[in-house]
From Swiss-Prot:
The keyword Ribosomal protein does not apply. Belongs to the pseudouridine synthase RluA family. Keywords: Isomerase, RNA-binding. This is Uncharacterized RNA pseudouridine synthase HP_0745. It comes from Helicobacter pylori (strain ATCC 700392 / 26695) (Campylobacter pylori).
């Protein structure tokens, strides 16, 4: 597949021209150029600063995804919560990295999407095709995938303007101090452990990023385990886990941010799940909300901790949303 554009005037830079035509940033145009997807007069473009002449034909290729052999463990079933021509909403299982990085050797969610022959947006680097937002490797739950660049741009803008609602469920080893709490701070890499993020209590420092989360208490067990809801206003690396550590609270099963004495004796993954996601459909502008069911392992663990009737009641999506709105 390809798109063709015609330059109507002389001397305009190619990156500026495509940024305007595609409604994306110049950096995103440069990523397309690096991937070898942009041609001018049938010649591959190497630099974004290429000066266009009136009548120049600019071609943008959409790469055809070819299935490739994958490790056996990647040939798994991932629940599709919603799908149309523009996007996917998936229920990501735990122990699956979303996209490749230098430190990532195992197959990723992007590999799985390509294996399943899904059309994906290609504004970012190849290893991030389709990815609008991320979930940590061990976190399960809802993730939105863009099938085309139009969708990617509009969903990214909703994230940037905080119009996309993302709500999580987590199980804490100790109850929150208050029924409703918020953390607003800057996050940066922990100098003592580069795998972790750390909240800065005061001013912004170099290489730190603004972050905000809100937490509500949903249910407390007889042995003081606390089921909570978490709302993201920003989406930084390990944000919920780092913010809870800032409050001296820890998620059951979190081997990175958790306290050793608070971890269960049996092996269990982190009890953190992206439960609700809200956004406006980029094309129809219809408001959409998806409840992403807890996966079996987490649900079974919660049933051991809480009475099923009480658990079902507090997991009602309307009650969770209302609790965040209420003062």
């Amino acid at each position: 597949m390809q798109k063709v554009f015609i330059a109507l005037t002389d001397h305009k830079r190619l990156d500026e021209f495509l940024a305007k035509e595609l409604q994306i940033s110049k950096n995103q145009v440069l990523n397309l150029i690096k991937e070898g997807l942009v041609f001018c007069q049938k010649k591959e473009v190497k630099k974004g600063g290429l000066a266009l002449k009136e009548g120049d034909e600019i071609t943008l290729l959409t790469p055809k995804i070819t299935p490739k052999p994958l490790k056996k463990e990647l040939d798994l079933e991932i629940e599709v919560i919603f799908e149309d021509e523009d996007l996917l909403v998936l229920n990501k299982p735990p122990n699956l990295v979303v996209h490749k990085a230098l430190s990532v050797k195992e197959p990723t969610l992007v590999d799985w999407l390509e294996f399943k022959n899904y059309e994906l947006s290609n504004l970012g680097l190849k290893e991030r095709y389709g990815i609008v937002h991320r979930l940590d490797k061990d976190t399960s739950g809802g993730i939105v995938i863009a099938k085309n660049n139009f969708t990617h741009v509009h969903l990214s803008e909703q994230l940037k303007t905080k119009m996309m609602g993302r709500y999580y469920i987590a199980l804490l080893s100790t109850p929150l101090k208050e029924e409703k709490m918020s953390v607003e701070c800057y996050l940066t890499r922990n100098p003592n452990n580069r795998l972790k993020m750390i909240a800065l209590k005061a001013v912004k420092k170099e290489k730190s990023r603004y972050s905000k989360s809100e937490f509500i208490s949903l249910l407390t067990s007889q042995n003081n385990l606390n089921l909570i809801g978490a709302k993201l206003f920003t989406g930084r690396t390990h944000q919920i886990r780092a913010h809870l550590e800032y409050l001296n609270r820890h998620i059951i099963g979190d081997n990175l941010y958790g306290l050793n004495g608070a971890l269960p004796k049996e092996e269990i993954r982190i009890m953190l799940h992206a439960y609700l996601i809200e956004f406006k459909h980029p094309r129809s502008e219809q408001k959409l909300r998806f409840k992403v069911p807890l996966l079996k392992d987490m649900l079974e663990y919660l049933k051991k901790v809480f009475d099923k009737e009480n658990l079902d009641e507090v997991l009602d999506e309307e009650k969770i949303l209302h609790a965040f709105i209420a003062k």
